[in-house]
Amino acid sequence: MGLLSQGSPLSWEETQRHADHVRRHGILQFLHIYHAVKDRHKDVLKWGDEVEYMLVSFDHENRKVQLLLNGGDVLETLQEKGERTNPNHPTLWRPEYGSYMIEGTPGQPYGGTMSEFNTVEDNMRKRRKEATSVLGEHQALCTITSFPRLGCPGFTLPEHRPNPEEGGASKSLFFPDEAINKHPRFGTLTRNIRHRRGEKVVINVPIFKDKNTPSPFVETFPEDEEASKASKPDHIYMDAMGFGMGNCCLQVTFQACSISEARYLYDQLATICPIVMALSAASPFYRGYVSDIDCRWGVISASVDDRTREERGLEPLKNNRFKISKSRYDSIDSYLSKCGEKYNDIDLTIDTEIYEQLLEEGIDHLLAQHVAHLFIRDPLTLFEEKIHLDDANESDHFENIQSTNWQTMRFKPPPPNSDIGWRVEFRPMEVQLTDFENSAYVVFVVLLTRVILSYKLDFLIPLSKVDENMKVAQERDAVLQGMFYFRKDICKGGNAVVDGCSKAQTSSEPSAEEYTLMSIDTIINGKEGVFPGLIPILNSYLENMEVDVDTRCSILNYLKLIKKRASGELMTVARWMREFIANHPDYKQDSVITDEINYSLILKCNQIANELCECPELLGSGFRKAKYSGGKSDPSD
């Protein structure tokens, strides 16, 4: 989760005093990197995935499942057995926000050959097996986007009570600080977001109105005035960073061959973010209730929203410099490539001094405004040992701001003095239950980048329409019910990367004729006379590539999953979870997920993930049986 400096974290007041210093030197660090590597070309295609995991403990006797707060110990063991013993170990493990979470990546990035697609799932299996092997009896490693009873009494093991007093990090009514990773970054981030905002974060998620759900659904918090004011009728109220950052996701990072290719990919993939988010929907439950949304994006956005009342436009600007329209965790606000310029129709708040400085240093308008927009934010954490740095050889101040702008896409300059190239990170996906599904989504996105670059595809539409798509993508059953703005003719491009922009795009104004509302089925699978479909385009690309039979078979299986999720033939994880709850004998059609229901659901998820049972409505009936079977949590053990 971004920069993980070690050391002594400063208080919020001290961090604030150094904010201008961090921004000033962050920009100098960016300029050093930019001037050193702006002309670097021919970096090879490399890419890698990041999977976030939750650790759970099953109490089979009492039919209860809890989040296991020993991520630190598990991580230490995995790193000791892995990368510290063998630098070429096939897996890497990193901390995540929750003390019940860990993050796993391949040990080395994947390369540009087609056969690499056949190794993704094997590596994910290795990770699952490796982490499972260090767990105790009745414990399991799960890839679940949101734990349904996160924030309910007794949801952690060991159990801890929330402490809503001022001294803590969250001050939450529901989420104990013990559930936050012990690394100083995470608790400090939590505390400083709250201090900067001037109040606790506010998350209100619409409740799903079932037959017996109270109407209006109202929760009362007589002991907490802040919560009483912030909670809304017919909504599930949450009050801590952990409700967002304590969820799991799936991300992919690509290295481009040059800065211009990275900027082109950043823009093109930004339009795909809402589509893939809806396709990967996997988080319908919050704080023990069934919600009316399927994705975590809005929850996580609100959970780290550090904007003050002035910045949110609720009071006139007096102590702050800017009115800011979005949380620092949200969709991108500007395209970076020349082709995207005319589609930049969102008002962009920038630090004009930084913008002018960047222009004077030879940075073009589009990149300068992107960086000047990121730098309207304050640093949220600062370590005493990291205040005075060598700007020519270090980038911690730049990364401090960059890594706490959590957007759908991230444009990543190389670290100083490294052979790493310009990268882009694709960030909107929800994590899936199985390694097969997670591999399918990763391979789909990576293949799409190959096709975008090979065929010079153009998905650009006005950025305001992408934002509208992001809102639709989070709605319940968006994959089947939602309509999304999408470009009609995606094949007009000339040599988009080399020329910076295709001939077809030289007109200064975008035309409403260029895009229309489409279903995800149309976007993914195509519709005659309307749109060719992304999967038919990927298939045509594959037909022209040298691919061995085994790899081709794997890729086709992955694409079949995406195709069938888009058409509705297979369910999203969110829809499958809703059906599971609705059909549970203990469910009272009141939108409440009890310990018993939660236990049954997570147990089933774990069995599916470890291939101890089939789930044709989620994976398809022909889902191939694999040799690996892990997990130590089945009650039949």
Curated annotation (Swiss-Prot):
Tissue: Most abundant in kidney. Also found in liver and testis.
Catalytic activity from the UniProt record: L-cysteine + L-glutamate + ATP = gamma-L-glutamyl-L-cysteine + ADP + phosphate + H(+); (2S)-2-aminobutanoate + L-glutamate + ATP = gamma-L-glutamyl-(2S)-2-aminobutanoate + ADP + phosphate + H(+)
Keywords: Acetylation, ATP-binding, Glutathione biosynthesis, Ligase, Nucleotide-binding, Phosphoprotein
UniProt-listed InterPro entries: GCS (IPR004308), Gln_synth/guanido_kin_cat_dom (IPR014746)
Activity regulation summary: Feedback inhibition by glutathione.
Domain of life, per lineage: Eukaryota
Function: Catalyzes the ATP-dependent ligation of L-glutamate and L-cysteine and participates in the first and rate-limiting step in glutathione biosynthesis.
Subunit structure comment from the entry: Heterodimer of a catalytic heavy chain and a regulatory light chain.
PANTHER family from the UniProt entry: GLUTAMATE CYSTEINE LIGASE, GLUTAMATE--CYSTEINE LIGASE CATALYTIC SUBUNIT
Protein name according to UniProt: Glutamate--cysteine ligase catalytic subunit
Organism of provenance: Rattus norvegicus
Gene name of the encoded protein: Gclc
